[in-house]
Amino acid sequence: MKYLPLVIMVTLAYLIGNISPATLIGRFYGIDIKKAGSGNAGTTNVLRVLGTKAAICTLLIDVFKGFIAVYIAQGRFNNLGAMLAFAAVVIGHIYPALFKFKGGKGVATFLGAAMALNWPSMFAAAL
């Protein structure tokens, strides 16, 4: 019973990772992003196919979902919980069950999750 909250958190992190803004924004524009451009459901393909505004929205949502999943897990659990949520949200982005296991590459989600773990290091690395 003591591991149940951790299992629930990891499952929720995976489901958060399943949110594919590239696919959803593509649907909003009436385009299947997985069949256009490079076929990848990621920010770069959205930039190529749909333009800058759609790509910025995709990027921000991908970063935010990685950040929020790890931030919540870190506040509720120890470092193990944060690391498991980190892995789950990135895996959920790359292999989303809601979109037939065809997602993006996970770069923006990874950066958001890493930012939640240690944001000063992420800003230093960006310089």
Question: What is the predicted role of each segment?
Answer:
Residues 47-50, 73-77, 88, 92, ...:
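Interfacial segments of multi-pass membrane proteins
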Residues 5, 9-10, 54-60, 65-97, ...:
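Nucleotide and nucleotide-moiety/phosphate-recognizing core
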Residues 12, 25, 32-37, 61, ...:
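Short, flexible coil/turn micro-motifs enriched in small/turn-prone residues
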Residues 16, 30, 73-77, 100:
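Short helix-capping/hinge motifs at transmembrane helix termini and TM-loop junctions
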Residues 23-54, 103:
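Cytosolic, membrane-interface loops and tails of multi-pass inner-membrane proteins
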Residues 14-20, 41-42, 65, 69, ...:
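Glycine/serine-rich anion-binding loops at beta->alpha junctions
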Residues 2-28:
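N-terminal signal-anchor transmembrane alpha helix
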Residues 26-27, 60, 71, 112:
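Hydrophobic alpha-helical membrane-insertion segments
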